């Protein structure tokens, strides 16, 4: 079915035949207005083809991550990207850079403006000229201090149905709660007190998608971001979009229909743009946003951060390995956004049903011991942990270890993410080897601040120039791994992976390119003890009798020990990472 026809069907499902038809006509006019105004990349992408390859990796950062006197932070960020990451990191996710009132950007006051304290759209476009730009569409809610909400409270008829109100005494007990905060808050309007739906906080008021004008407005903003250079758009908190009393108001069928609508719009007017859904929920629910390959192009691997942390805490990859075996590559039509750290904490919910409760409890205690904090949410059974707030390096590498060991252990954890099928997303504080920022939590009172420190640009550069600093060791090691990853098409997100048997302390994976001509054997030791792995000699399809390997990161030639004609063995040092490909004589 053509995208235009899919749009018509979806809008009829969402709004009913009559309103759906009117909304489709309005959408058709909106899309016509954008045609020819959207800057496509040099390469044209056919609808249905995932425009990613092994060179893709995304830096996750705030727009004001780096401060330098007399310069807009977005301009400083652009300089850092061009000077230090060109040719190594292909994309950048700039977290919300719009005027905001709270939540470090996720309470948007004006969707079409750049925060003037950070820079201008010119700064954003300049970054998009050199890097694949990922932008947030914060579409579940906006700021209670926004012009939209102000006009709603004033009784402006243009905005009277932009937000969701409920009558006092309405039974909301069946609504899924991601936070330990009230679901509704009272505001004073021109008509008197009103109770407004607030999924996340009093300052984040939920938008009413039962009003087609809200949906059309967000589609227009989506395309505006594309016009400014965005090639990946993150649908923030999308799982909670559609509200219907009597349902949990999470993963509603009409929410999925809205995602399908955005996908159809991309295929119609901007097929080079990728949609990624942010749904911090159990794995099975998370991947439901692939739909029938007609929703998100990418979903976050929310289970990965807690599973990798568990593997390093217990020196046992068993649960990580079994979960990785369930990952479907879907023939390369969609893929995963692999990450271990972000501006948020480590989600507990995605690990439920994968890790035993006692291991999750042990992880929570370990996070506390390593200087982290725990955030809770409300359930009918009371408040339960939903997020571990800690810098990932602080979580993985104990502070009493020497710097080289801390760096090596942390980089081994990152190698798991870089090895798995999907596109890597690397949080700036992981790339830079940052640690817990407890002083920030004391300043803001927010647990998440522990991993959101803003940095002096000159101060960071000074540390990176010191080869003995933890920042330098992590940064240089990370760049080496990223450069090595770009050497082999086996790491293509559309490729294949096979999870291998190995000692419980070793995560072993075979990656294969989409055309099956390149392969990499990925080995990561999650313990400090040397380990030996034995594999069949025929493990590489492209070179079944290979007697020599090339290690991609170091470029060294490795000679495995031949156990017999059918098997070889490889030894890994503590926290060692090996990416091995069959040796090919360059002569």
Swiss-Prot record:
Domain of life: Bacteria
InterPro entries: GGa_phosphorylase, Glyco_hydro_13_cat_dom, Glyco_hydro_b, Glycoside_hydrolase_SF, O16G_dom_2, Sucrose_GGa_phosphorylase-rel
Alphabetized UniProt keyword annotations: Carbohydrate metabolism, Glycosyltransferase, Transferase
Catalytic-site annotation from UniProt: 236
Reaction(s) catalysed (UniProt annotation): (2R)-2-O-(alpha-D-glucopyranosyl)-glycerate + phosphate = (R)-glycerate + alpha-D-glucose 1-phosphate
GO biological process: carbohydrate metabolic process
Listed EC numbers: 2.4.1.352
SUPFAM superfamilies (alphabetical): (Trans)glycosidases
Similarity remark: Belongs to the glycosyl hydrolase 13 family. Glucosylglycerate phosphorylase subfamily.
Function noted in UniProt: Catalyzes the reversible phosphorolysis of glucosylglycerate into alpha-D-glucose 1-phosphate (Glc1P) and D-glycerate. May be a regulator of intracellular levels of glucosylglycerate, a compatible solute that primarily protects organisms facing salt stress and very specific nutritional constraints. Cannot catalyze the phosphorolysis of sucrose.
Name used for this protein in its record: Glucosylglycerate phosphorylase
Naturally occurring in which organism (per UniProt): Spirochaeta thermophila (strain ATCC 700085 / DSM 6578 / Z-1203)
Organism taxonomic ancestry: Bacteria, Pseudomonadati, Spirochaetota, Spirochaetia, Spirochaetales
